[in-house]
Amino acid sequence: MNTRRGFIAGSALAALTACGRSNKKVIGVIPKATSHMFFVSVHAGVDQAAKDLKVDVLWNGPQNETDFARQIEIVDSMIAQQVSAIAISATDERALVAPLERAIKSGIPVTIFDSGVNIDDYVSFIATGNFEAGCTAARTLAGFLNGATDVAMVMQKPGGTSTVLREQGFEQTIAKEFPQLKIVARQYCMADAARSRTVAEDILAAHPNLGGIFASSEAASLGSIQAIRGRNLSGKVKLVTFDFSKTHVEALRDGTVSAMMVQDPFHLGYEAVHSLYRTLNGETPPKRQDLPARVILKADLDKPEIQNLVQPKWLDETH
């Protein structure tokens, strides 16, 4: 992705130079992590909005979404640079409260996207309906299982609102609607794909009769795919994943993944910038925007509307 990295660096430098100047609008966008495919897709939406709306964007975030200290530093840096507005996907719903309140008190409007923060004075909160998506994931996994069986959850990390809500939705739906299913393991991968493989392998070893796994994030999914393949359990242990990458799609095609829950991160990034653009121009965007997640099965993969989600044209252009 060298072409894209060059563009990112150039646009960030241009935006940085513009900060503090006259009436030039610079919107700072802070993802949870720059290393995940999900946020690469968010970035593409951010860039498209910047082009369409003729604003500059300063994109900066921690490499890993467990690094809330780095995200706090970035917020404070953007305050010091006097950006016009900030959009953020918070690594932790509590740790980011004070820095974002500092931004708001300094006159910088803030939009929250993907993962919430415990503040009230934000412009807009834009996210997938994560609790509902978790409920849907539970129903989807249950549909692949026959009779009473054990299931497990490979989870992201504590404190990340988006994934916590998915996990709560999954767990509550299993308990209420599928009493024949028992959740025998709930383990965090701490947003690390390598660690998620170890977690999933440990679960599979401890529960040889496991019927299914729900992996609540991109990292959790990638490790779970590897663990199931490594034990030759593709198709035997049903796996419902969240988010997408080339690995997810290949695993759905070969039967390792039974279903993918897919968001629309491009739209998420676009709307985050758009909400702040509207605010900076005296408009009032919706306080909350919920974007749906979709269930994708193997039979759906070649449908044009699904291809636009899992293999968007912009991705081909940047590889």
Model-derived features with residue positions:
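Extracytoplasmic "Venus flytrap"
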Residues: 28-45, 49, 53, 58-73, ...
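Hydrophobic alpha-helical segments within soluble ligand-binding/sensing domains
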Residues: 71, 126-151, 165, 195-197, ...
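Flexible loop/hinge segments that line or gate small-molecule binding clefts
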Residues: 93-132, 139-143, 150, 156, ...
